[in-house]
Design a protein with these regions (language model features):
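Conserved functional hotspots at enzyme active or ligand-binding sites that engage polyanionic ligands
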Residues: 1-114
Length: 114
């Protein structure tokens, strides 16, 4: 399976615990391509949600369905960044633009006080 940073994939996440991400949902591949091309069994992703109200939260990014291949407008929720097993990635949906990727890094910088 070939994955690249900025790709959007469907992920079959397990049942959520508390307010964590779960179930089948789109995710953005956040992990760098050096690691994506390696033999690592895991990949770092940012889960997406169709709850567009979360776009108002600091660091989150509203992704337009028309620009990404997503079935509906969604929000990259940077506070839920997780590492998952690659086998949970089921189908590539699309890709975020370089502009969105830059906004994603700014959101992560904010999350980590950088």
């Amino acid at each position: 399976m070939v994955i690249s940073q900025g790709d959007i994939w469907w992920a079959a996440l397990p049942e959520p615990v508390g307010s964590g991400p779960g179930f089948d949902r789109p995710v953005v591949i956040a992990q760098g391509d050096t690691f994506n091309r390696s033999q690592l069994a895991t990949v770092v992703v940012i889960p997406l949600t169709s709850n567009t109200r979360l776009a108002a939260m600091p660091g989150n990014i509203l992704l337009s369905a028309s620009n990404t291949g997503l079935p509906r407008d969604s929000v990259a929720n940077v506070t839920q960044i997780i590492a998952i097993d690659r086998s949970l990635l089921t189908e590539q949906i699309g890709r975020i633009s370089p502009r969105y990727l830059e906004l994603l890094w700014k959101g992560l910088d904010l999350l980590f006080d950088r």
